[in-house]
From Swiss-Prot:
Source species taxonomy: Bacteria, Pseudomonadati, Pseudomonadota, Gammaproteobacteria, Enterobacterales
Protein name: Cys-loop ligand-gated ion channel
PANTHER family hit by this protein: NEUROTRANSMITTER GATED ION CHANNEL
Residue ranges annotated as Periplasmic topological domain: 1-203, 254-263
Species in which this protein is naturally found: Dickeya chrysanthemi
Domain of life according to the entry: Bacteria
């Protein structure tokens, strides 16, 4: 380790294991999620004397005393954590051959950019990014990463199904450190990605079904005889869809793209607006003395079939992509 052997210019190899105990509190609006787990880091420094030549266990506040006496323990931090993570119990195991095993429990709220284009049929990744706070990749390198997710594999947490975890070790350059540490501004980083699939059941019953009923009600204008009743019904339901859009906007952050639910709402706007144009056109032809009941009769079938086809395409695309 750098503190144990300053003459050794080689970086210290640190292997890391992360055990995910629980993922919960997924906040779609703020794009955050809470992770409860354990981190185990292992590296090798100089051989040391231990009582009885057996591993020595040091816990919690005693660790600071060993660090103050010269024991090298790198500060590892999750860089995508929101605020300060709660680190519970900590433990060091010191071996006579120089090996050090650091074990700590952590609980924190993490953030990651999420893609909601297929919402509520979307898939997301819960990401953990770990870096050394002070040591660049010429001093410390992550050599291995193992992730254990047995407690959450194929389980439903909140509205998510956990699928699998993948890991990646990379070097990250921080250009703002170039003036302070020339050629020493690259840091080793561990990235853990946990794949999750949203369970859309809640949104199907609470959002998509009511929207479908509102739009289906708008087709009743093709069975009404009075022109004024047709217009009044259409405009009332158009305002209902507008209010529905405001309601659904509170479940997601402001996005520069449309989601599946947005596209369904847009299809609803289009359906009601097209119905308004058609009943006005039919009324105009009737005022001109041209009776055209066939147009209205065709709309009774064309509108439900057209919207059903659009809805099926959106749902199937969201499920299969």
């Amino acid at each position: 380790a750098p503190a144990d052997n300053a003459a050794d210019a080689r970086p210290v190899d640190v292997s890391v294991s992360i055990f995910i105990n629980k993922i919960y509190g997924v906040n779609t609006l703020e794009q955050t999620y809470k992770v409860d787990g354990y981190i185990v880091a292992q590296w090798t420094g100089k051989p040391r004397k231990t009582p009885g030549d057996k591993p020595l266990i040091v816990e919690n506040t005693q660790i600071e005393r060993w660090i103050n006496n010269g024991l090298w323990v790198p500060a590892l931090e999750f860089i995508n954590v929101v605020g300060s993570p709660d680190t519970g119990n900590k433990r060091l195991m010191l071996f006579p051959d120089g090996r050090v095993i650091y074990n700590a429990r952590f609980l924190g709220s993490f953030s990651n950019d999420m893609d909601f284009r297929l919402f509520p049929f979307d898939r997301q990744q819960f990401v953990l990014e770990l870096e050394p706070f002070s040591y660049n990749n010429q001093q410390l390198r992550f050599s291995d990463i193992q992730v254990y997710t047995e407690n959450i594999d194929n389980e439903e947490i909140d509205e998510w199904w956990i699928r699998k975890a993948s890991t990646h070790i990379s070097d990250i350059r921080y250009d703002h450190l170039s003036s302070v540490q020339p050629n020493q501004n690259e840091f080793s980083r561990i990235t853990v990605r946990i794949d999750a699939v949203r369970n859309p059941s809640y949104y199907l019953w609470s959002f998509i079904l009511p929207l479908g009923l509102i739009i289906a009600a708008s087709w009743s204008v093709f069975w009404l005889e009075s022109f004024s009743e047709r217009l009044q019904t259409s405009f009332t339901l158009m305002l209902t869809v507008v209010a529905y859009a405001f309601y659904t906007s509170n479940i997601l952050p402001r996005l520069p793209y449309t989601t599946v639910i947005d596209q369904m709402i847009i299809a609803g706007y289009g359906s009601i607006f097209a119905a308004i144009l058609l009943i006005i056109f039919a009324h105009h032809r009737q005022a001109m003395g041209v009776e055209d009941d066939l147009l209205i009769q065709r709309c009774r079938l064309a509108f439900p079939l057209g919207f059903l086809a659009i809805g099926c395409v959106l749902v199937i695309r969201g499920i299969t992509l």
